[in-house]
Regions:
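Beta-barrel outer-membrane channel/assembly domains of diderm bacteria
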Residues: 2-132, 172-178, 252-257, 263-272, ...
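Surface-exposed coil loops of outer-membrane beta-barrel proteins
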Residues: 35-39, 46-51, 92-105, 121-229, ...
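A general secondary-structure junction signal
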Residues: 83, 136, 298-300
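Well-ordered beta-strand positions enriched in small/hydrophobic/aromatic, beta-favoring residues
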Residues: 114, 201-203, 235, 417
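Active-site beta-strand termini and strand-to-loop segments that position acidic
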Residues: 117, 207, 241
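A short local loop/turn or secondary-structure capping micro-motif enriched for an aromatic residue
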Residues: 191-193, 223-225, 303, 360-362, ...
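Long, internal scaffold/assembly segments composed of regular secondary structure
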Residues: 212-214, 221-301
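Short acidic/glycine-rich loop or secondary-structure boundary segments that cap or lie
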Residues: 267-270, 301-315, 360-364
Length: 425
């Protein structure tokens, strides 16, 4: 969503600046990913995918326009439109999304929405108490555990990993904010690659007590061409707290943070209910060089859980593992442990090391005898070169257990390297 504060006077693509902070600007983002792997699908890619997957590249080019115009009482009309040219080439991606397609190139509209903010019109309720928007746009809740990305990527749309398609086919959103309380009313329709669309309507509530505690939830109902989704009601509750900071506890324990989310999916017509949840603890060593942050997360999704519209908000959330979570297993019928260590050796560079352990929640339902699936190690180096250019280097190694060998037919360690770059104006 466009904010006037995002319009910097130095933006080389800004072509209009009004006296009241109104603006209009062109936007441009270019993303490129280079991928190489060894022993993909644990050495059995040809049987699992129909052909080998060794290396490939992806790119997207996203030109667009953004604007904001201020009215009396600091009311604001804003909007955005952009298109995405997505490409995959050089080989079969690790998900085989371009199987039988070869090199893929696809151009289509991504975002196209407009909105209005109330400014000081309801001054007693706070600045921008009301925000109404409609059109092709992305609706994000929390860290993307449930609602984040609504359009399919890969296949004949190209760029499977970069994922240039995230906006809903249509979304109408009413946001209300006063003090620490945020209430959203939302209706949207997703934009899948298949013709099986899903409509979602409901409400999201979040209350932030202060920097140390928040709680939120949502209630949504679905109308879908997919039988197991049609008529489903979704209940979501989530929260985060720094318990020792909130209680003015010992100084050394104040950086400790606990986050959790639980989703229950209630179905009719003989379909079983689904449940997914996680609990995450993290601690930042604020007085130590490089300010390391150590995180542990346990996540569990039963065999009836529908991942709906989860997405990538950060490394590991909610694609769990740069091999397993990206290409092999989604967030259903899966239990996982994650340990993450993140350090910042100097300001523009962050280094993250991940360990994952994956087990199948119900091995029989998955079609294997052993629920132990795989372990994975990931190394991610992020470099913010400047305000416009960022680079990431990813190295990953997935080591199969008996469940993965039974599932894929392979028993070799799967290695993976990716170089990603983004230029954004």
């Amino acid at each position: 969503t466009v904010h006037a504060a995002d319009a910097e006077q130095t933006n080389p693509l800004q072509f209009y600046t009004g006296s009241n902070n109104s603006f209009a600007k062109a936007t441009l983002q270019v993303e490129v990913g280079l991928f190489d792997q060894g022993n993909s699908w644990f050495g059995n890619a040809r049987e699992a995918l129909g052909e080998d997957s060794d290396s490939w590249w992806e790119s997207i080019i996203r030109p667009g326009l953004e604007g904001s115009y201020f009215l009396p009482n600091t009311q604001e009309i804003y909007g955005q439109v952009d298109a995405v040219q997505a490409n995959t080439g050089g080989g079969l991606d690790a998900a085989a999304s371009n199987a039988d397609l070869g090199d893929v190139s696809d151009l289509r509209i991504e975002n196209a929405y407009a909105g209005w903010r109330s400014g000081n019109l309801f001054s007693s309720l706070g600045e921008n108490f009301l925000d109404i928007s409609f059109g092709r746009q992305q609706y994000k809740v929390g860290d993307g555990f449930l609602l984040y990305s609504y359009a399919g990527s890969g296949g004949d749309r190209g760029a499977y990993w970069i994922g240039g398609r995230r906006a809903a086919e249509y979304a109408g959103i009413v946001r209300m904010k006063t003090g620490g309380l945020n209430v959203d009313l939302v209706y949207l329709e997703n934009d899948p690659i298949s013709n099986d669309s899903t409509e979602l309507g409901g409400a999201t509530v979040n209350y932030t007590f202060n920097d140390n505690a928040s709680i939120g939830g949502g209630l949504y109902t679905l109308d879908s061409d997919i039988d197991s989704r049609d008529g489903m009601n979704v209940f979501d509750i989530r929260g985060g707290v720094k318990p020792f900071a909130l209680a003015n506890g010992p100084e050394a324990l104040r950086p400790l943070r606990i986050d959790a989310e639980y989703v229950h999916e209630d179905r009719d017509d003989g379909f079983d209910a689904g449940n997914g949840w996680h609990i995450t603890t993290s601690y930042q060593f604020e007085q130590v060089a490089w300010q390391p942050t150590l995180t542990y997360r346990y996540a569990s999704f039963d065999e009836n859980y529908d991942t709906l519209f989860y997405g990538f908000a950060d490394w590991g959330s909610w694609y769990q593992g740069e091999i397993i979570g990206e290409y092999v297993l989604g967030n259903s019928n899966l239990d996982s442990h994650m340990v993450k260590l993140k350090v910042q050796p100097f300001e523009p560079v962050a280094v993250s090391l991940f360990y994952y352990n994956f087990t199948i929640h119900d091995a029989g339902d998955f079609g294997v005898k052993d629920d132990a699936y795989a372990d994975e190690l990931d190394l991610v180096i992020d470099w913010s070169v400047n305000d416009h250019l960022s680079l990431s280097l990813v190295g990953a190694l997935a080591m199969p257990d008996d469940g993965a060998t039974e599932h894929t037919g392979g028993d070799d360690d799967w290695s993976y390297v990716m170089l990603y770059g983004s230029i954004k104006f």
